[in-house]
Swiss-Prot record:
UniProt xrefs under PANTHER family: DNA MISMATCH REPAIR PROTEIN MLH, PMS, MUTL, DNA MISMATCH REPAIR PROTEIN MLH1
Function, in words: This protein is involved in the repair of mismatches in DNA. It is required for dam-dependent methyl-directed DNA mismatch repair. May act as a 'molecular matchmaker', a protein that promotes the formation of a stable complex between two or more DNA-binding proteins in an ATP-dependent manner without itself being part of a final effector complex.
Gene coding for it: mutL
Pfam family, one: HATPase_c_3
Protein name (database record): DNA mismatch repair protein MutL
Family affiliation: Belongs to the DNA mismatch repair MutL/HexB family.
Amino acid sequence: MSSPIQPLPLNVINLIAAGEVIDSIAAVVRELVENALDAGATRLVISLFPESWRVQVADNGTGMTLADLRHCALPHSTSKIHQLDDLWKITTLGFRGEALHSLAQVADLEIASRCTSDGVGWCLRYQSSGEPLREEPTAIAPGTIVTVGNLFGKMPVRRQGLPAISTQLKAVQSFIENMALCHPQVTWQVWHNQRLWLNISPGKTPQQILPQLLKGVHYHDLQFVSQGVKSPQESTQKDLDLIEVTLGLPDRCHRHRPDWVKVGINGRIVRSPPVEQAILVAFSRTLPKDRFPVCFIHLTLCPSQIDWNRHPAKVEIYLHSLDFWQEQVSKLIEQGLRLSPQTLASAAQNQRVGKLLKASEEKASYRVDAKDHQTDANAVGLMPLKAVAQVRNTYIMAEHSTGLWLIEQHIAHERVLYETLQDNWQLIPLETPIILTKLSDNQVEQLARIGLEIEVFGEQLWAVRTVPKLLSTREDCPEALVELSIGGDLQTAQVAVACRSAIRNGTPMTLSQMQELLDQWKTTRNPATCPHGRPIYLSLEESSLSRFFRRHWVIGKSHGI
């Protein structure tokens, strides 16, 4: 006979709950870091001693009074919410009041803290119930130091079941890097067994942070754009919601996995497959095949738009008006991918230019003017590009106010045509149909799928009565239609039509024709790469040309005096 149903003892309830909140070393770091950021910290020092199951987090936040220290580790004790309605007004990273109590349940907990207004700090040790065990005054700078020792000492099975130390440290690193992106103004130091392991300097935007996290990515490989947006459901909202996008320019950096497609909401990285998919779609046909973008989206939204109370670690949320935010993210990414004064100015720092200059730099030493040739980000419109020559009937040489550009004519035109086809996939009827032979059923279905009018004309013969307008006057239109029939979606067909219809390399162009192409290309949505992901242009800024021709040499030395 089974045992009768009865309530669990309180200590068992607390231990079960603590095991759900604190399940690893990374979870300890997560909870303490979020508390520190909620306290306004701008500098965090995290010390890890994983072999001895000890973690310490020190911050320069507002600190706690002695009265708060006595209550902070009690169950469900928090200063962040006070009533039911507050659950829909959450502006902090933490709100449940579970973290410190859970730590007291599964580890030895000690907290030292001092408010700026107090002349002395206090250090308290806690019982597993969260009640203070010992308290004493201590000399400490304003802020808080939380020390967690003997982690999972009361749960030996949990210790044995945890991943290897290296795996746990990787989880800590991933969390810190994510938080650094969401809070770029914060200085981060992580020590492992008293050796500096991770150091992240602060910045104004994630554009300064991301190069510290991703090897091979530089500041000028990235673009940062932001925009205030009025929430669709908040008619009385005074402050605009904010969308910030930090993206890798597709001709300069991309990944073989989508591991750097990240979404942050109100200071925390979250899993949001719909928004992540919107990011991938926005980058479609800008990257090489099987490559993925570097893109970090951070949404700062009205609390009423979000329900955080979905996952213990708050990595999953309910987001109201999801379709609206997907659309806004797509629009802002599109804006970031366009040519702008910022990208024109940063093109001089392109790694491809650096490689061209490297050989010259190795053979001679010369003084380089350290001026930073930045363009006013508030400039209206784009810098004019003036066509000056054609190189080998393939590259357009264009001049602008700060240097020289080389643009490959075929893929620049391909980008123009592709976006035109995206906006207006125009099919026109033919006076005389094109007859195709020996098509499979799949090929016939494919042509019909992309909108072409096709019908049987005889045995193994098919008549195509409508074709894309760009192909209608081409002599190789039948071959192009066979190519389109091979497979792929409408987007693939549009790329194929654009590629076949674009100006071929080796075709002479007049200055007016080149200028017309430049004017069309620089206003496209994704001018950096062709639809196959190849870079379209190379920028040689005046500063780079000066370096190559050694215009900064000291005159006497350059003449051997």
